[in-house]
Design a protein with these regions (language model features):
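Short cysteine-rich clusters marking metal-coordination/redox-active sites
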Residues: 9-12, 30-33
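Short linker/helix segments within small regulatory modules
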Residues: 19-28
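Anionic N-terminal interaction surfaces
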Residues: 28, 37-92, 96-100
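Short functional micro-motifs and their immediate structural scaffolds
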Residues: 17-18, 38
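Acidic, Ser/Thr- and proline-rich intrinsically disordered linker/docking segments
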Residues: 114-267, 274, 279, 283-284
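Cys/His-rich Zn2+-binding "zinc-finger" mini-domains, especially FYVE domains
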Residues: 5, 16-17
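Short coil-to-beta-strand transition motifs
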Residues: 100-112
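Residues immediately within or flanking Cys/His clusters that coordinate Zn2+
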Residues: 4-9, 27
Length: 284
């Protein structure tokens, strides 16, 4: 069979479109049959049509299971993580499966961990193209270079450039809230000159132990580097982490999220919290 010959769907026998088909270890699924799979499932290129049939049978059986699912705990924006503690089960209240009214009911033992992963804005405004982002530049419009401007030192000492929420502000918040082990801040948090990038959004990354679902991710709305919005979304993500840790018997962070440097009322400090971190001083 040639490379561009028509491929047939292993499930329904119809033609599998070149651009919309799903590859299996042996054969393909057409776009219509592909939509029957769970939106969180993955690894199909290493699976067979027998795996597809088993998965679809499980998806159909899940309808009855979900009909008896009664959540008594939830966390996150729009209650994205919902738990039925009596049955020891949970669902993700977002994504295709949720929208279609048949979210997979997972056992609590299938959830291995959850991490908060910030996404950073890789494009920082620099009107004079001197390597110093405008929010840190005391002399916009000059040709002063980032090296001469001691960019790394400024990046270390500031968390809020012109009232924005960036990587340094996030690190301060993470430390004060006791969430260090639950937040992954990658190397893309700073630009090539060492300046902290603004936080664009947050991702919740759930690691799963399930035959068909290895990882589930939820993406927040854009926080656009705004302290109030960023802190609110971070708190909501932290609530998900806290609930998961309680369910799994892990230590739960007790610190609050109030940050005096942000000029916001913040969240209520919990008893026995980590000491509050000092604010960042703006240059004169």
């Amino acid at each position: 069979m040639g490379l561009f010959d028509a491929k047939m769907c292993e499930l329904c026998g119809e033609k599998a479109g070149m651009l919309t088909k799903l590859k299996l270890s042996e054969g393909f699924l057409c776009s219509k049959c592909k939509k029957k799979l769970s939106g969180f499932s993955s690894g199909w290129s290493a699976r067979t049509i027998s795996d597809v049939n088993a998965h679809l049978q499980a998806r159909e059986a899940n309808r009855a299971i979900y009909s008896s699912f009664v959540p008594d705990m939830s966390a996150g924006p729009d209650q994205l993580f919902r738990v039925d503690s009596r049955q020891g089960a949970f669902v993700f209240a977002f994504g295709k499966d949720w929208t279609e009214g048949n979210p997979t009911v997972f056992g609590l033992n299938s959830l291995m961990s959850v991490k908060i992963v910030p996404a950073f804005d890789v494009f920082q405004e620099d009107a004079d193209d001197d390597g110093v982002p405008d929010r840190f530049d005391r002399t916009p419009g000059t040709a002063q270079t980032a090296q001469g401007f001691a960019g790394s030192a400024i990046a270390q000492s500031m968390g809020l450039g012109q009232g924005s929420f960036d990587a340094v502000a996030l690190q301060n918040l993470v430390m004060s809230s006791g969430m260090t082990g639950a937040v992954e801040i990658g190397t893309d948090s700073r630009d090539m000159h060492g300046f902290p990038r603004e936080v664009r959004s947050f991702v919740l990354k759930f690691t799963m132990n399930d035959p068909y679902v290895q990882q589930v991710t939820w993406n927040s709305m854009s926080v656009d580097g705004k302290p109030t919005v960023a802190m609110q979304v971070f708190q909501q993500c932290a609530e998900v982490v806290g609930l998961v840790q309680r369910l799994k018997g892990m230590p739960t962070p007790q610190a609050g999220y109030a940050q005096p440097a942000f000029g916001q009322p913040g969240f209520v400090q919990q008893p026995n919290a980590f000491p509050q971190q000092p604010g960042f001083t703006q240059p004169g």
